[in-house]
A protein has these predicted regions:
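Active-site rim helix/loop that mediates acceptor-substrate recognition in acyltransferases
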Residues: 34-55, 69, 118-120
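Conserved active-site alpha-helix within GNAT-family acetyltransferase domains
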Residues: 117, 147, 171-188
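Conserved acyl-donor/pantetheine-binding loop and adjacent beta-alpha core of acyl/acetyltransferases
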Residues: 74-129, 194-197
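Conserved acetyl-CoA-binding loop-helix of GNAT-fold acetyltransferases
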Residues: 136, 142-155, 180
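Conserved GNAT acetyl-CoA-binding A-motif
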Residues: 128-129, 157-170
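A short beta-loop-alpha structural element at the N-terminal edge
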Residues: 4-19, 72
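Conserved beta-strand-loop-alpha-helix junction that forms the acyl-donor binding cleft
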Residues: 132-134, 138-141, 166-176, 192-196
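Conserved beta-strand in the GNAT
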Residues: 57, 63-72, 128-135
Length: 209
């Protein structure tokens, strides 16, 4: 795709990041309270950003096409400046739970996070870097944008003398991309989501360089 720019993150990108998260992970399939969905999405994004030391964004004009968030062990760089007191209100810490249905839907989200913890349990010392969040918009897939973003992150990790990384993904995402880029699937865990009566496969992928 022509005219794509790969750049650092800006505060103005965060709303587009949220939209890409909702589209990629289909949170709205099992969280139907719109206010709750907003809080879950923004909290997930903030947590991912605050745990990262490197972010690269692909954009064309004013539109974000994709982004990658990474962490290398030992790098103290952070992006906390994106969340100043002036915009902290956009990232509430209290969930707007109104009824039992909301509680059940939150429980589904927690199940997925617990599955990721289970996948990594006992393996933490195998890795010195990770990809916290990596999304390319559906319209921009297959155009080399994901591969370019990944290469930026690998170059960064190499500069930090990292040797192995991990990431979590699941079958809502294009996990075949990681296989095509030389990643290995180290483990997988099935999660039953009662609200949609289906299983979600979660994966731990690794890469050594």
């Amino acid at each position: 795709m022509k005219d794509v720019i790969y750049r650092d993150v800006k505060k103005e990108d965060l709303c587009e990041f949220e939209n890409l998260i909702k589209d990629a992970f289909n949170f709205d399939k099992f969280i139907h309270n719109k206010e709750l969905l907003k809080v879950i999405t923004t909290s997930y994004l903030k947590e991912s950003i605050c745990e990262s030391s490197f972010i690269k964004v692909a954009s064309k004009g004013d539109k974000v096409l994709g982004f990658i968030l990474c962490k290398a062990h030992g790098d103290k760089a952070n992006y906390n400046h994106l969340f100043t007191p002036l915009n902290e209100g956009k990232y509430p810490t209290t969930l707007p739970i109104e009824n039992i249905k909301d509680e059940n839907e939150i429980a589904e989200f927690i199940k997925i996070k617990e599955a990721y913890s289970e996948l990594l349990n006992g393996k933490e010392n195998l890795f010195d870097s990770c990809i916290n969040l990596f999304i390319v918009s559906e319209e921009a897939r297959g155009l080399g944008i994901g591969k370019t973003l990944l290469n930026y992150s690998l170059k960064y990790m190499h500069s930090m003398k990292s040797s192995s990384l991990y990431l979590f993904t699941d079958d809502r995402c294009n996990y075949g991309f990681y296989k095509s880029q030389g990643f290995n699937c180290l483990d997988e865990v099935d999660v039953y989501l009662k609200t949609v009566d289906s299983n979600l496969k979660t994966f731990l992928y690794t890469y050594s360089y």
